[in-house]
Regions:
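Short, leucine-enriched amphipathic alpha-helices that occur as contiguous helical runs
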Residues: 20, 37-38
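Short capping segments at the starts of secondary-structure elements
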Residues: 36, 47-53
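A short acidic, leucine-rich amphipathic alpha-helix
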Residues: 56-62, 73
């Protein structure tokens, strides 16, 4: 029997202070000052475990009393993505979503409800094993992969 672990809907774990420190150090190492909007976006990303759109990150910043423009959020996301500090996730609805790229390579995949639009993270060790088995079979080196399963969540079924 296969074990799949998924976060309950709307339940997020923080990305960890390790990622936040790593992101700030990477910005400093390449000469970017980590002020204002960059600090706010990094803090918002560090407080999530699953992907969020620029608009959702902007709303999260505003909800915690931070003030920055949406254009600054987009610029910061572009910078962080260019430094491989965040992963861009395409869930198929035309909205780019972002999440921390953990320095240790830890990652998860996504379940997307086509009815309500909810996105839920899941991890399945058997799936990871199968991906690497296929790669070995066809003599291919996998550097990264994204799995997005689309369908209907428990609430919408």
């Amino acid at each position: 029997m296969q074990t799949v672990s998924a976060s309950p809907p709307h339940h997020h774990h923080s990305a960890s202070p390790v990622w936040e420190a790593h992101a700030r150090a990477a910005l400093a190492a390449q000469g970017s000052r980590a002020g204002g909007a960059r600090q706010l976006v990094i803090a918002a990303l560090a407080g999530q475990d699953c992907c969020a759109s620029a608009q959702e990150i902007h709303a999260r910043i505003a909800a915690t009393g931070g003030t920055t423009g949406i254009a600054s959020v987009y610029r910061t996301l572009d910078l962080l993505h260019g430094l491989s500090l965040i992963t861009r996730i395409d869930t198929g609805d035309g909205v780019a979503r972002f999440e921390p790229a953990h320095p240790d390579g830890a990652h998860h995949h996504h379940l997307v409800c086509d009815t309500c639009g909810s996105v839920e993270a899941f991890h399945d060790e058997a799936l990871e094993t199968a991906i690497h088995a296929v790669a070995d079979h066809v003599d291919f080196r996998v550097d990264a992969h994204d799995i997005v399963l689309r369908g209907a969540c428990r609430t919408c079924r």
